[in-house]
């Protein structure tokens, strides 16, 4: 990347010293940012308890911990969204406090949130410079200058987007890149990235890592929150671990391995992340022949046995999710045959799929799974409510007993069934949604990105459940973008590329190299 990764921004306003503007580095301090004895509580919850953290200039600090460990709360304090109850923040060696996110931005701290915060009906340029618009001599917004600055910024970040394109027309991955460009545009010394690769492709991940490397070479400090351990060992200089609102420790990334990192995160050793299972010996339950959906995927064929876990791998846009949605009747196929339990079936809608014995856990639990304003019980009972209703009455007692039983079996951690599901951790939300579908007694369970956005401890729980269900004879289709997960859990792996089925690998022959080769569109000979 040539030159600096920042464009010449529209002029910044003068900053009040009380918000930390104009801080000069302390020559005696080796740290860019220091967090000392920070505590933060909410009604009935201690989110952070006497935590500490330090960030060196020109380094990447990975922040790891299970959901609910306090990572996001601490980042929101650093970014000025929350104020701590006790403790001190030092920036460039000087004590500082932020009363608003704007004051943190003006002091040189920018945060890229996991939940994107762009305005869909505004252009890329307008989103990047909102609140900092360049004015012309008539004190009107100078759109030409904003376009120039944006084009320069995007070019230096090698982001190939039109500054005038509406953000609403962009893919999730492209919006993520705009968020990154916006944060870089502030020329901040500290950048906080919260799960920045959760919705982007492998190619875009590499692009992001090259941007991070460039920013690091300029002396920027980057705090990188992720659940993906391979990313930690690829780009992080140091790793800080949080657990249950407390600071566990900080180590050089090069001195750690996956096992030691997991042990620090969960407080116990996960000796076997992927449970050992016997090879399934059940009969063929589902047979798919030449299944096609015009313009999306074509001639997909596979058999699925009772008790088998079939993994589906492929890059974003390969058609994996579309195949799952077709099997569940969301988008019925144009051609091909589906045989279920020896009989040819036509699945025209999800209701038919559920009646046959199919269940689908969708890839985006927030968008297509959860009813965030409803309780845990209301979310869990959604798929079976009709079975417990009649003559104007709902069998609440029987439903409650069923939900309580599923919570115990799946180890869903919630204060009560009446708790708003939006307050649970990602892992517990996912287990509650899995419980919803298990209550329908499915014979084929389709899981689309079952562990996306959940911590390693919750992942181990999901893997245990999948293994248990398969051992009881349930047929499982698991779609995942995480290759170790696909290889560790699947009896066979089907690989797709741009709507085409490239091949099916047996567990004994499946490797990351072979899967990626197929996923990139190359046949394995």
Swiss-Prot record:
One Pfam family recorded for the sequence: ABC_tran
Residue span(s) of domain ABC transporter: 33-269, 279-523
EC number: 7.5.2.11, 7.5.2.7
Uppermost EC category: translocase
Broad class of the protein's primary localization: membrane
Molecular function GO terms recorded: ABC-type D-ribose transporter activity; ATP binding; ATP hydrolysis activity
Subcellular location(s) per record: Cell inner membrane
Chain sites annotated for binding ATP: 65-72
Region (Disordered): 1-20
Recorded catalytic activity of this chain's protein: D-ribose(out) + ATP + H2O = D-ribose(in) + ADP + phosphate + H(+); D-galactose(out) + ATP + H2O = D-galactose(in) + ADP + phosphate + H(+)
Membrane-topology descriptor: Peripheral membrane protein
UniProt keyword terms in alphabetical order: ATP-binding, Cell inner membrane, Cell membrane, Membrane, Nucleotide-binding, Repeat, Sugar transport, Translocase, Transport
Protein family: Belongs to the ABC transporter superfamily. Carbohydrate importer 2 (CUT2) (TC 3.A.1.2) family.
Protein name as it appears in the record: Putative ribose/galactose/methyl galactoside import ATP-binding protein
Annotated source species: Pseudomonas syringae pv. tomato (strain ATCC BAA-871 / DC3000)
Taxonomic path: Bacteria, Pseudomonadati, Pseudomonadota, Gammaproteobacteria, Pseudomonadales
